[in-house]
Amino acid sequence: MKSAELKKSLLLYAVTDRAWLGKTFCCETLSDAVLQAIEGGATLIQLREKEIPEKEFLDEAFRIKEICASKKIPLIINDNVKIAKETDACGVHIGQSDMELKEARKILGAEKIIGVSCQTVEQALQAEKNGADYLGVGAIFSTSTKADAGNVSISTLKEICRAVKIPVVAIGGISLQNMSQLKGSGIAGVSVISAIFAQQDIRGATKELKSSAEKLFLSFSE
């Protein structure tokens, strides 16, 4: 994927969370939820699974990949390079404590997307140097989804965007209500979890987020 295409696909980056299944979740399956998110305007899907067995993760990844491929939406796998490789997903997103970026690149190849989570300018510059295609920076706002995520100020987010040439996505607690605070920060888009997948109307919620994200993104190119 070319850099311009990648940047465009990062506008509304939806990260799955099966924790909402059977609660406020409006869908029977994660596949249904992903389809609704895409129909609402999600520009990229990250499949994030922390609690299920590897085989179940792999099966789910194949199901989600089929949906994403049919809608021409990139699929990124969270952390698991093996599953990203086996499913031929568009790429993988790794954290600071996960597999080394260079090793992931060796396994996946030059054409695949590799994103890296960062919280400091130093981490961002190192990830860029090591060949990251984009950065996920956060948590910007408090979040219950990732209890171990440290907070990153909007000021630091801006510093990171200025320091690197690769696109940056803001992550952590982002919602329709607080997204406007990120205007002018330099990000390519926002990564959201509960603002999409915890909603009764996933398609409608995603549509509203997409509209706001478009205004946010356009403000950066002025």
Task: Set out the residue ranges of the language-model regions.
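Glycine/threonine-rich flexible loop motifs
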Residues: 145-149
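Internal alpha/beta core interface subdomains
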Residues: 185-189
